[in-house]
Amino acid sequence: TRGPGEKKLEMDRRLIKNRIAQLNRELREVKRHRELTREQRTKNRIPVVAIVGYTNAGKSTLLNTLTGAGVLQEDQLFATLDPTTRSRKLPSGQEILLTDTVGFIRKLPHHLIDAFKSTLEEAKYADLILHVVDASNPQMDEQMYVVYETLQRLEAMDKPVVTAFNKMDRIGESLTVRDFKADRIVQGSAKTGEGLE
């Protein structure tokens, strides 16, 4: 005979299974919507720039500074879960779209990459990768490696890369850095706007 604990366990399992099914349906819908949006952008020929970087590098702050987006800026893991895209006109008059992505972390488990795949895919389909690096972080080199390793796993390393060494206001001096994967390097501060011209 079954006791009340077993019935509760079965009910909890069913609720969890239903919730997982609902989330999978929602993820499929989000993926479908993003694919349609990407098709529309391609049709309109608006270049897309994916803002990528290690967690807390200042990606959302940079997006806000460049576009006035008002995206949540938090010093916490996975503060950005859903990519935000905003437009900006360049001095030449060309319109571009900037997309903020989830921050990368070291040893991100494969199942989490799968969970964030629809968010991280923005980098795969972008025309340019803007790699934001926290220049004040002592583990900057390791974090850069993690970002490139993740982009490689996403098959997104065939794009031009601009590396933006951010938070220069915290270190107060220019860096002598090398990024062999970058086509161009800039230094500045998303917080103060310095170096973003």
What are these regions (language model features)?
Residues P138-L151, V177-F180:
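Conserved P-loop NTPase nucleotide-binding/switch module
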Residues V102-I105, A135-Q139, K167-G172, A190-E194:
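Conserved nucleotide-binding/hydrolysis micro-motifs of P-loop NTPases
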Residues H131, T163-F165:
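Structural beta-sheet core signal
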Residues E10, D75, H110, P138-D141, ...:
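Ordered, soluble secondary-structure elements with a strong preference for glycine-centered loop motifs
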Residues L112-N137, E149-A156, S189:
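Inter-motif core of Ras-like GTPase G domains
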Residues T1-L128:
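Conserved G1/Walker A P-loop phosphate-binding module
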Residues M157-V162, D169-E197:
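Canonical P-loop GTPase G-domain recognition
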